[in-house]
Amino acid sequence: MSKTYLGVDIGGTAVKLGLVDENGAVLRRAERSVSFDGYKTPILDTVQAAIHEFLTADTPRLEGIAVSATGQIDSRRGVVAGTCGNFPGWIGVDIKGTLERAFGLPVTVANDANCMLLGEVWAGAAKGYTDVIGVTLGTGVGGGILTGGRLLEGARGLGGELGHFRLHALNGVACTCGAIGCYERYAATTALVRDAQKMGLDAPDGRTI
């Protein structure tokens, strides 16, 4: 019988859940907002509530939980090491330890853009390639780099952070990371909403656009 895993994607707007088999097929999925009350509820509390609701009585036995999370992730410890200011109260959160205690399953945690890249290499558009660059566009902008078949994480887990290379260093838009003119401030959903509203459009969020 095929092994089943729980995939959890924690983004700046929502947490997405999926039951996934060992071949990468998604058996069931769900989504819940993490910003529904302006982040007053701790993000990991929302994530745990979503998982409890998602795991019904007929859920197959799980082998483990794999978490892709926004921010600078210490993948060895499963802890959030840093953010660029998009996600309040996120730095220092022990995702791995908290979820292992709550659900009694082994948990692996990595940066969301790196997970996207590895997923594409494993079972998607980049299957069979050893040198790949991937870019994620969402609440923020993320990136992952595979070179020679190895993921480039860097000493601090920032090796693929493409959202923070600077397009307009002298007179650009201020970024939440503290720099000026980062790519994220022009390409992310938040940037599109900002620009649409400046044009007088009714655009409360990215889904509307």
Residue ranges with predicted function:
Residues 2-45, 49, 60, 79-82, ...:
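Short glycine-rich, Thr/Ser-proximal phosphate-binding strand/loop in the N-terminal lobe
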Residues 13, 70-73, 138-140:
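Short glycine-rich anion-binding loops that position phosphate/pyrophosphate groups of nucleotides
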Residues 18-20, 28-31, 38-42, 100-102, ...:
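Glycine/GP-enriched mid-protein hinge/lid loop-to-helix segment characteristic of carbohydrate kinases
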Residues 21, 69-73, 169:
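Short, small-residue-rich loop/turn micro-motifs
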Residues 21, 63-67, 204:
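Short coil-to-beta-strand
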Residues 36, 40-48, 52, 61-65, ...:
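Glycine-rich phosphate-binding loop and adjoining helix at the ATP-binding site
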